A protein has these predicted regions:
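Exposed aromatic-hydrophobic patches
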Residues: 325-326, 432-437, 519-529
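Extracellular/virion structural assembly segments
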Residues: 562-658
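N-terminal beta-propeller domains
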Residues: 2-182, 198, 205-213, 236-239, ...
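Loop/turn-rich, solvent-exposed surfaces of beta-rich toroidal or solenoidal domains
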Residues: 335-356, 372-412, 474, 483
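Non-cytosolic beta-sandwich-type ligand-binding/adhesion modules
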Residues: 5-11, 16, 33, 38, ...
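Repeated scaffold domains used in trafficking and secretory/extracellular systems
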Residues: 134-151, 183-197, 225-242, 279-295, ...
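Blade-level signature of beta-propeller repeat domains, shared across WD40, Kelch, NHL, RCC1
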Residues: 430-467
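Beta-propeller fold detector
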Residues: 177-182, 218-226, 268-279, 321-329, ...
Length: 658
């Protein structure tokens, strides 16, 4: 007998040993042994009471559903792993259905991306309203909402001096009336704001007012910018703390900010006004972009170079204004493009990188959080209603310009807020410079180079899609994806297309036709011909083919898979371990103490805990890499008269390494 080490033959299964240990092989050179473990040869001790067993190792752990709401993981019987979503009311923005970071109780109500869908009703995914271009414009334009004699109107202001209608009123039914034409205001409009039912308009040399509450409304010049002209794209004006506040840089680079009282008389020169303390000492050419308010202060913001910032101003009981104090400084290379105060406690920050939500304390100081979402083209406009805020984005909704909705009532574990894409200006790109809410919640927004887009009162978009996060069941092991179940209303009001999404393509699974009344359960074999570690699905909802006011609705879905990890084997091997043994050729081998020596050697191998090579010469001798899990020595005979005769049967339990 010889125990030697050798490398595996090229025809043998490759051995991958990450520990760097060297397993021992045994080559038969004399005695005909049955088995070798880590190079230690043995004769099989197979009997009725000590059989040789080889079985599949358990690969599914017993699980107890400890989620907040016990559900799919507590189901038994089918063997499926199930992942379902019955609501998407926490919006988009996840990559994985089982979060690498964050709160799993929130992630299960979110999806990856979407367009044209409204997820905000708990337990229901439906289509959004469509929008229509109602008034074209070649440059910038602004839109505001107002109420006159109980009726809602939109007020559109055109920047371009060549626009025939500089101020246009639109009713909820679409009736348009020009209020100010290009003979009344001949200069380029740099900024505009609504407040107290007054519309204030800023040109390079003048500040105009149009009061909708006047008996006979007409354009009136309240102020003259009688020093250097106001510089284009560096003017901000808004109605805060019961007054209009303007902040601007001149063409010569000076900076200033004024509180403007309503002036019904002759035009007042700015040179006679007192600037807000601190507004004249900002960097030359500072770009003012926003004025807004909270419960305890108002704020003036903008940027210098790549540094965005905002300043706080308070108003005392006499109406006097404090000195400007900086309360917001954005990270380097992030410009402040817009601010929008809401509910007295929040200030929305539109930046060159996206949107941040700032919270205001009782002293009017501001602390902001991380980016709620990123927008590579910046955010220039907001509006709000109830707990929702809408932000305008350029090419941010499926490559088109539109709105993204943020739910301030749904803070997330990452200190952000739930959000989702919303209304879209179809096939259009350009900055959104204003957003307004009118007519019981309808939205209107202006797109630079396009014009005024208004949400339709009843009609839905033709289709909308959402893509789920990647479903992995918290493991990268392969799965056999078997079934997809879809839940909808009893009668489907529009088609639903379902596809599997990969990194490079979307493979169509099926189309559920409008009018279908059955519940839907689909075999995934057509889009999963092979096992895969993960899955993602895209659902496309369509509008009703004959009624534009209704469309497909989804209540939820569930995906089912079976785990398919490489199976390990548990092998139970009985071995003779006596001082004297005979191999299958009749050769006598051993010596006194032979059994104890081999048992000790085998136990030493087990104690190291490394993988070992098991060779079963009765089954061809193919080497198997395994870990010894248990060694049991059974001795059922008494010692001889010399009180020796140590020996018995060793049962080795090993698990193959896969």
């Amino acid at each position: 007998m010889a125990i030697t080490s050798r490398a595996p033959h090229i025809t043998e299964r490759p051995q991958i040993d990450l520990s760097g240990s060297v397993s021992q092989y045994y080559e038969i050179t004399g005695n005909a042994f049955d088995v070798a473990i880590a190079g230690l040869p043995f004769i099989l001790g197979v009997t009725d009471s000590t059989p040789y067993r080889r079985q599949t190792a358990e690969f599914r752990t017993q699980r107890v559903d400890q989620e907040r709401d016990p559900g799919e993981q507590s189901l038994a019987g089918s063997g499926y792993w199930i992942r379902s979503q019955s609501s998407l009311h926490l919006g988009q923005g996840i990559n994985y259905q089982e979060p690498l970071e964050g709160d799993p109780d929130q992630t299960k109500f979110r999806y990856k991306t979407g367009e044209g869908i409204d997820p905000w009703t708990t337990g229901q995914i439906k289509l959004l309203k469509k929008t229509t271009l109602t008034e074209a414009a070649t440059g910038k334009s602004y839109v505001f909402s107002t109420t006159v004699n109980g009726a809602d109107f939109l007020i559109k202001v055109a920047e371009s001096a060549s626009a025939t209608s500089r101020v246009l009123r639109t009713s909820t039914t679409g009736t348009e009336t020009t209020l100010v034409n290009n003979t009344a205001i001949t200069e380029k409009i740099l900024a505009a704001a609504m407040g107290g039912n007054d519309l204030m308009i800023v040109t390079p040399t003048k500040v105009w007012r149009y009061s909708f509450d006047d008996t006979s409304p007409a354009i009136h010049q309240d102020y003259a910018i009688n020093s250097a002209d106001a510089a284009s794209d560096k003017v901000a004006i808004n109605y805060v703390k019961s007054r209009f506040v303007i902040a601007y840089s001149t063409t010569s680079g000076t900076t200033q900010s004024y509180a403007l009282a309503r002036n019904t008389g002759s035009s007042i020169n700015f040179s006679t006004l007192t600037a807000i303390n601190g507004s004249t000492t900002l960097p030359s050419g500072f770009t003012f972009t926003a004025v807004t308010e909270s419960s305890n202060a108002f704020y003036i913001g903008g940027y210098s170079g790549d540094e965005g910032m905002a300043f706080k101003v308070t108003v005392d009981s006499s109406g006097a204004l404090s000195t400007m104090v900086r309360v917001i400084l954005l990270p380097k290379s992030e410009q402040l493009l817009q601010m929008y105060g809401y509910l007295g406690s929040y200030v929305m920050l539109g930046t060159s990188r996206g949107v941040r939500v700032a919270v205001v304390d009782t002293d009017g100081n501001v602390s902001y959080g991380p980016l709620v979402f990123e927008a590579t083209n910046g955010v220039y406009a907001f509006t709000a209603r109830n707990s929702f805020v809408w932000a305008g984005v350029n090419a941010g909704v499926g490559g088109q310009t539109g709105l993204i909705r943020i739910n301030l009532g749904a803070p997330l574990a990452n200190n952000g807020y739930a959000y989702a894409t919303d209304l879209v200006a179809t096939s259009v790109t350009g900055h959104v410079h204003s957003v307004a809410t009118f007519d019981n919640g309808r939205k209107a927004f202006t797109v630079e180079g396009s014009g005024l887009w208004i949400e339709h009162s009843t009609d839905l978009v033709e289709s909308g899609t959402f893509t789920t996060g990647l479903i992995r069941f918290d493991t990268l092991e392969n799965k056999a994806w078997k079934r997809l179940r879809l839940r909808t209303p009893d009668t489907l009001q529009g088609d639903i297309q379902i596809a599997r999404v990969t990194e490079t393509a979307a493979d169509a699974l099926t189309t559920v036709a409008q009018g279908t009344t059955e519940q839907y359960d689909y075999d995934l074999a057509v889009v999963f011909p092979d096992v895969s570690p993960d899955a993602s699905f895209r659902f496309t909802l369509s509008r009703n083919s004959s009624d534009a006011t209704t469309g497909a609705v989804i209540y939820g879905y569930s995906a089912k898979a079976l785990p398919t990890p490489t199976r390990a084997r548990v092998i139970q091997i009985p071995l003779f371990c006596f001082d004297r043994e005979t191999d299958k050729l009749g050769n006598l081998l051993g010596y006194e103490g032979y059994a104890r020596t081999r048992l000790s050697a085998l136990e030493a191998v087990e104690g190291v805990g490394e993988t070992v090579v098991i060779q079963d010469f009765t089954a061809g001798g193919e080497p198997i890499e395994a870990v010894i899990e248990q060694i049991t020595f059974i001795r059922s005979t008494p010692p001889n008269r010399n009180f020796s005769g140590f020996g018995g049967i060793v049962q080795v339990v090993a698990r193959t390494v896969v």
